[in-house]
């Protein structure tokens, strides 16, 4: 029996609901970026889904506050600026997650209680789309935004069980998951001094290597699980037939897949759970799909997910261990995070020796102390955490009132339970800020890892990220230090010099200012704020700062951070030094296709369309051919694509004299440009 859905109208006013919806949307976008781009999730899948579900429920109750760019309407993105962009030729959507039998069976009963369903392993790896033409592998593309992905074909060709030539000259587009077996991961990680957290992160990072020779060294594999056969004369009636065809084409498919009646799904799940711990590859659940293709077509899609499939996520596996020690770390933002050292246990294929405690409230609630026997789980199969205390240890651990690094009295920020060190000169804060700046997804400075940066700071060579660009002046002294020989220094200096080629898109987020990460930076660029100089100009004008609230995805907390950061003399001095060092303080233009008919144009979309579902597909097309997609109409918008149901955007476009296209006119425009949109989106 399904549970009655929670409502919020009795507890939230419209004003409060608007704020909560905006805050939830920002938070979800942040976690989508961490998961899809950085491969560094901060929360479990379950916690993410609870955020997502609450936002979706609130948007249903308060539809007037639903943003057209809400995370509930789009797929998370793993787009990377280092790769050519590729317009997907089939929908690349995500699945709605379920976490218990009741929730899953409720969906089955509503969908087709007597129908046949496939039940298969949900592989925990990196999502990929393979495009074959006439039997030859043409492209391997990441999921990306769902419309446009990163072309990683050269890397995909190195995956050992992907066929490069098929036994028949067929055109087929497939979805699959690149992964690494536990055995291969352990062996590779041992050779790499244990620096990789888990198979999923390593797999995702491997297909994004800039040099395919590096990818080839990594023992990657793939399972394919769905396909589209454009132009194929034989129409498949079932998912079972599609999987059978894939096997005949020599594609590996997930093992143990079964096809059962809806009434047998709960029993089947129990059988899969018994097998889970014996698998040689990482999985975080099951995928249940309608087998009948015609029934799938009848169910259709939301803009985010197919209605005919669900992911069933396993409960986190727990293992018992003993707490050996409790320590705390001061991050670059000043946040003080406790963690426990435990006796080693194996979880989800990796050896775990540390687990998170989050904050003092969490510690007090569990009663954590040294010597305690605890249960540890990997949240979402990734993040180890103490979930339960079985036998208490010594006194419950207390986070100190003073920063463990600089002894400054700690503070609590508004509406947060965490403690923070407020001292911007705190050694641990500064060191972690420099470490963050040098990371691959930031300024990507080769040769400068955690240990090297800690050494350079502790021995007085650097005190800020700007000091990195003067480090070469100290070469004669540095070369005398252990571990900093001629070869090592050459790599470091080359890495520092190479970082000057990273533009504003990377520089602003890498500085590490609160609320100004990659997502906000992209939003600013989308709205024409594409340089540090432009930001500093806005920061001097309160009206212009307030106008940033008109950008969907930017809320009051971002505005507050904007005001505080760019009036801070320390930040202004840092920016001046980076500018003098020759860094690129303006965003470079991005090209995704050799053909650029929409170059210099900014398009917005509103209403609904027959040929573009969801409507963002039309904007993906514009971006692919050189244009820019914007989420709101402004004086800088050049074109508006308007369909039935267009509202305030159309009114504003008419007021501003912006060129407006309806769907037929847009299709005629594409035809005149010799763009076959059906072969592109």
Swiss-Prot record:
GO terms for molecular function: DNA ligase (NAD+) activity; metal ion binding. One of its GO terms (biological process) is DNA repair. Keywords: DNA damage, DNA repair, DNA replication, Ligase, Magnesium, Manganese, Metal-binding, NAD, Zinc. Zn(2+) binds at residues 403, 406, 421, 426. CDD domains: BRCT_DNA_ligase_like, LIGANc. NAD(+) binds at residues 45-49, 94-95, 120, 143, 177, 289, 313. It holds the Pfam family DNA_ligase_aden. It comes from the Bacteria. InterPro entries: BRCT_dom, BRCT_dom_sf, DNA_ligase, DNAligase_adenylation, DNAligase_N, NA-bd_OB-fold, NAD_DNA_ligase_OB, RuvA_2-like. Residues 593-681 form the BRCT domain. It catalyses: NAD(+) + (deoxyribonucleotide)n-3'-hydroxyl + 5'-phospho-(deoxyribonucleotide)m = (deoxyribonucleotide)n+m + AMP + beta-nicotinamide D-nucleotide. The keyword Magnesium applies. The active site is at residue 122. NCBIfam families: dnlj, PRK07956.1. HAMAP family: DNA_ligase_A. Belongs to the NAD-dependent DNA ligase family. LigA subfamily. This is DNA ligase.
């Amino acid at each position: 029996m399904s549970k009655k859905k929670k409502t919020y109208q009795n507890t939230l006013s419209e004003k409060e609901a608007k704020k909560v919806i905006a805050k939830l949307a920002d938070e979800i976008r942040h976690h989508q970026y961490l998961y899809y781009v950085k491969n560094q999730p901060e929360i479990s899948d379950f916690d993410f889904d609870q955020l997502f579900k609450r936002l979706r429920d609130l948007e249903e109750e308060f539809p007037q506050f639903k943003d057209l760019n809400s995370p509930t309407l789009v797929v998370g993105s793993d787009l990377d600026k280092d790769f050519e962009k590729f317009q997907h030729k089939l929908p690349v959507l995500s699945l709605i997650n379920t976490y218990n039998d009741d929730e899953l069976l409720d969906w089955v009963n509503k969908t087709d209680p007597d129908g046949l369903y496939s039940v298969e392993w949900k592989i925990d790896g990196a999502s990929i789309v393979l495009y074959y033409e006439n039997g030859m592998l043409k492209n391997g593309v990441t999921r990306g935004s769902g419309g446009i992905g990163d072309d990683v074909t050269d890397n995909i060709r190195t995956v050992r069980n992907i066929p490069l030539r098929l036994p028949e000259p067929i055109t087929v587009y497939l979805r699959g998951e690149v992964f690494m077996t536990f055995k291969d991961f352990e062996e590779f990680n041992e050779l790499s001094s244990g620096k990789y957290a888990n198979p999923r992160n390593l797999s995702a990072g491997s297909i994004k290597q800039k040099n395919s020779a590096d990818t080839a060294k990594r023992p990657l594999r793939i399972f394919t699980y769905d396909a589209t056969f454009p132009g194929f004369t034989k129409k498949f009636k079932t998912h079972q037939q599609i999987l059978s065809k894939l096997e005949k084409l020599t594609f590996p498919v997930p093992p143990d897949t079964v096809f059962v009646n809806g009434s047998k799904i709960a029993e089947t799940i129990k059988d899969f759970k018994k097998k889970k711990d014996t698998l040689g590859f990482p999985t975080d659940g099951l995928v249940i799909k309608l087998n009948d293709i015609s029934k799938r077509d009848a169910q259709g899609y939301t803009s985010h997910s197919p209605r005919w499939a669900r992911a069933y996520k396993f409960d986190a596996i727990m293992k018992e261990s003993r707490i050996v020690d409790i320590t705390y770390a001061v991050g670059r933002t000043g946040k003080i995070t406790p963690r426990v050292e435990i006796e080693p246990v194996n979880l989800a294929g990796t050896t775990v020796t540390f687990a998170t405690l989050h904050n003092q409230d969490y510690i007090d609630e569990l009663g954590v102390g040294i010597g305690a026997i605890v249960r540890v789980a990997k949240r979402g199969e990734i993040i180890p955490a103490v979930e339960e205390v079985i036998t208490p240890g010594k006194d419950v651990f207390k986070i100190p009132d003073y920063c463990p690094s600089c002894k400054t009295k700690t503070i609590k920020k508004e509406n947060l339970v965490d403690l923070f060190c407020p001292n911007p000169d705190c050694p641990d804060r500064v060191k972690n800020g420099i470490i963050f700046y040098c990371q691959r997804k930031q300024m990507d400075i080769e040769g400068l890892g955690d240990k090297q940066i800690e050494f350079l700071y502790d021995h007085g060579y650097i005190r800020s990220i700007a000091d990195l660009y003067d480090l070469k002046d100290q070469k004669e002294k540095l070369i005398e230090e252990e571990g900093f020989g001629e070869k090592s220094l050459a790599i470091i200096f080359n890495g520092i010099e190479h970082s000057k080629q990273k533009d504003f898109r990377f520089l602003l987020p890498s500085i590490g200012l609160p609320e100004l990460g990659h997502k906000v930076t992209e939003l600013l660029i989308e709205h024409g704020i594409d340089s540090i100089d432009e930001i500093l100009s806005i920061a001097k004008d309160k009206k212009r700062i307030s106008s940033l609230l008109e950008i969907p995805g930017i809320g009051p907390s971002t505005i507050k951070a904007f005001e505080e950061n760019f009036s801070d003399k320390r930040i202004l001095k840092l920016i001046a030094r980076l500018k003098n060092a020759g860094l690129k303080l303006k965003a470079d233009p991005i090209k995704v296709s050799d053909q650029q008919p929409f170059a210099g144009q900014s398009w917005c979309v509103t209403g609904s369309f027959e040929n573009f579902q969801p409507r963002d597909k039309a904007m993906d097309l514009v971006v692919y051919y050189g244009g820019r997609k914007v989420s709101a109409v402004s004086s800088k918008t050049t074109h508006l694509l308007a369909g039935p149901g267009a509202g305030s955007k159309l009114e504003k476009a008419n007021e501003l004299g912006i060129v407006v296209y309806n769907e037929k006119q847009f299709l005629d425009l594409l035809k005149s440009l010799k763009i076959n949109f059906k072969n592109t989106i």
